[in-house]
């Protein structure tokens, strides 16, 4: 493994445990501990533990911080409170998604933005440049934080045993600061990237190995990036760099709920997003399920039954839950019809698929 790759505080723990390490977004990360299927199914039926310390953390603070945060982000940041986080997008002037992220308000005019690992430097530079017009400071604090995710139907009961607050009623994106977890001070967020109940835990970077070891003493399955990807795909959750990019808008990506272009406040990309909200976007993201044998992979072309290309695959895998090959595709809006049969070009073969819901695990 190259010494140039960044490493989380848990890297040595993973090497010692025999986890398979791969490069991801410039980081040396575990792709699996046992098998992807085993880890995936543990999260769907019981619970799994992920190291997500590679994610970036950026602080925005100052007397004008709230105005800067709203100017940068596509959602209505007035709805962000010291107990309620928000999923949102960092957009360019064309409405394209520079990154998708979560915003936490730590106190008045102090915000924590959690961004994708491979985009941290790019995001920071973009925010730093835009902040020059505001009385606000942008600080990259990524090295100070560790982040763990406990996910699965049994996650809440486990977390409750070791925290000093009641988590039984915590709803998605609610969070609490200064929570004691295995004796360490953490931010506890009811969030995740699997489609299951669970929590993301922000801790001091130095505390991450201790917390990892303590959690694993409770019959929790350690999980790698492989299961994280299959889990998020079953749930229809997008990945930046594949399903989201600087040339794809929130309306095209299926995350319109993260864009609020009708609010009074201005933000970058607002005019384009307002037009797409009022008039529709030319493309949309759909779920696909393969009818014939073959796994849809990123970049594979999608055609209608008349042979016209209507889009391409952005993500795909074989679902460990159902055994079916599934994917997400960005297609022309006028080609969309739920249940419609399409053709995916899998190498030299044309393979039939059908349009389905993106979230394939929703009850």
From Swiss-Prot:
Entry keyword Nucleus: no
Record's keyword annotation contains Signal: no
UniProt catalytic activity: N(6)-[(R)-S(8)-aminomethyldihydrolipoyl]-L-lysyl-[protein] + (6S)-5,6,7,8-tetrahydrofolate = N(6)-[(R)-dihydrolipoyl]-L-lysyl-[protein] + (6R)-5,10-methylene-5,6,7,8-tetrahydrofolate + NH4(+)
Alphabetical UniProt keywords: Aminotransferase, Transferase
TM annotation in the entry: none
GO cellular component: cytosol; glycine cleavage complex
Gene Ontology molecular functions: aminomethyltransferase activity; transaminase activity
E.C. number(s) listed in UniProt: 2.1.2.10
GO biological process: one example: glycine decarboxylation via glycine cleavage system
Enzyme class, spelled out: transferase
Coiled coil: none
Self-association and partners: The glycine cleavage system is composed of four proteins: P, T, L and H.
Function description: The glycine cleavage system catalyzes the degradation of glycine.
Family recorded in the similarity comment: Belongs to the GcvT family.
Name under which the protein is recorded: Aminomethyltransferase
Organism of derivation: Staphylococcus saprophyticus subsp. saprophyticus (strain ATCC 15305 / DSM 20229 / NCIMB 8711 / NCTC 7292 / S-41)
């Amino acid at each position: 493994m190259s010494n140039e790759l960044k490493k989380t505080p848990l890297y040595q723990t993973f090497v010692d445990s025999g986890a398979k390490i791969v490069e991801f977004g410039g980081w040396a990360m575990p792709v699996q501990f046992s098998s992807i299927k085993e880890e995936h199914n543990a999260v769907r039926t019981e619970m799994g533990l992920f190291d997500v310390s590679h994610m970036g953390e950026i602080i925005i603070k100052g007397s004008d911080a709230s105005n800067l945060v709203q100017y940068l982000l596509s959602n209505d940041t007035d709805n962000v409170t010291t107990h309620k986080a928000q999923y949102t997008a960092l957009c360019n002037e064309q409405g394209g998604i520079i990154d998708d992220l979560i915003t936490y308000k730590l106190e008045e005019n102090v915000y924590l933005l959690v961004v994708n690992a491979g985009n941290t430097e790019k995001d920071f530079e973009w925010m730093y440049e835009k902040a020059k017009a505001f009385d606000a400071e942008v600080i990259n604090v990524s090295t100070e934080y560790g982040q763990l995710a406990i996910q699965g139907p049994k996650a809440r009961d486990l977390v409750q045993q070791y925290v000093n607050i009641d988590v039984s009623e915590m709803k998605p994106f609610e969070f609490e600061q200064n929570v004691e977890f295995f004796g360490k001070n953490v931010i506890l967020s009811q969030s995740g990237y699997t489609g299951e109940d669970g929590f993301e835990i922000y801790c001091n970077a130095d505390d991450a190995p201790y917390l990892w070891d303590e959690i694993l003493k409770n019959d929790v399955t350690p999980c790698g990036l492989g299961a994280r990807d299959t889990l998020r795909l079953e749930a229809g959750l997008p990945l930046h760099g594949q399903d989201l990019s600087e040339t794809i808008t929130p309306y095209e990506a299926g995350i319109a709920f993260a864009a609020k272009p009708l609010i009074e406040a201005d933000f970058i990309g607002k005019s384009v997003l307002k037009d797409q909200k009022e008039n529709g976007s030319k493309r949309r993201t759909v779920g696909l399920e393969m009818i014939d044998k073959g796994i849809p992979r990123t970049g594979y072309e999608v055609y209608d039954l008349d042979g016209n290309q209507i889009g391409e695959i952005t993500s795909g895998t074989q679902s460990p839950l159902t055994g079916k090959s599934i994917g997400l595709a960005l297609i022309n809006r006028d080609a969309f019809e739920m249940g419609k049969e399409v053709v995916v070009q899998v190498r030299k073969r044309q393979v039939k698929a059908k349009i389905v819901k993106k979230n394939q695990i929703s009850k």
